[in-house]
């Protein structure tokens, strides 16, 4: 990475007008109405299960991308990196999306509280008898009450971290107090440990427990790698669009875009490495409680085509597309590459 001093920000202050600020609660209201209508008509048409999985897919995309941006902020302070100062604010804003995402999690957690099992089969009565003795060991963890308590803790921690960095960063813009940077750097050490722990258990709860019999200790790393990749793409895309609109034209340089592209390239390979390593370990062990998960997704259902497509479109194409130094320094190319990565991550 280019360990250069951060540029002096001279762009005019950008703020939302009063009219635009008023659109925020209106947007939340429209979203709530839309989710409610989808729930009602999906229930009436017998398609609630399909709606639930579609909503979970989109929610997981937004959550993992926001968490990837929060990781970017924490690691920037932890390593005392100077190259990313001008793009760090973009990541801080995306990390703040974790607060409204707590509200958007309600369509997932409320059905769990009500005892519905369209998403999570462990939430239905008698699931222990159907699963056999292996489920007995998961009984205390996969319970309705603990599921809700854990998610309250996750969002409380993430919101605190995001608000802490965003609040201190914006306050430093006003006061110029260098001590705020030192505080963020010191707190980033223990925050990284807590953040990593929440990622592990949140990935278990949100996605791995969709199939409660299956287990993999590498799945949280897989979830994390995809989230960071999506977060880097979102940061890069937003920075490029801001510059195209005439803002921060000189503050974000080609070298910084090159660094972001290198990180995207690295996490593309890291995501593929973790995905293959998880598959290899399960294939080698050949334990039925693990192998059925891959058997269904590659050979016993229509999802096999989607799984093979991930290998091509999520790994090979972005890996080869971001390999050359010249393309990583081309803003137009990075614009389309960021959009592509976000789409394939979703």
Please provide the spans of the model-predicted regions:
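Membrane-helix interface "capping/anchor" motifs
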Residues: 323-334
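N-terminal signal-anchor module of multipass membrane proteins
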Residues: 2-68
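Non-cytosolic membrane-interface motifs at loop->transmembrane helix junctions
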Residues: 52-58, 87-89, 212-224, 336
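Functional transmembrane alpha-helices
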Residues: 71, 278, 343-344
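Long, contiguous internal "core" modules enriched in hydrophobic/ aromatic residues
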Residues: 18-45, 138-313, 326-327
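Transmembrane-helix bundle segments that line or gate the permeation/cavity pathway
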Residues: 52, 59-174, 191
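Long, repeat-rich segments with strong aromatic
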Residues: 233, 309-321, 344-346
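Central hydrophobic cores of alpha-helical transmembrane segments
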Residues: 333-343
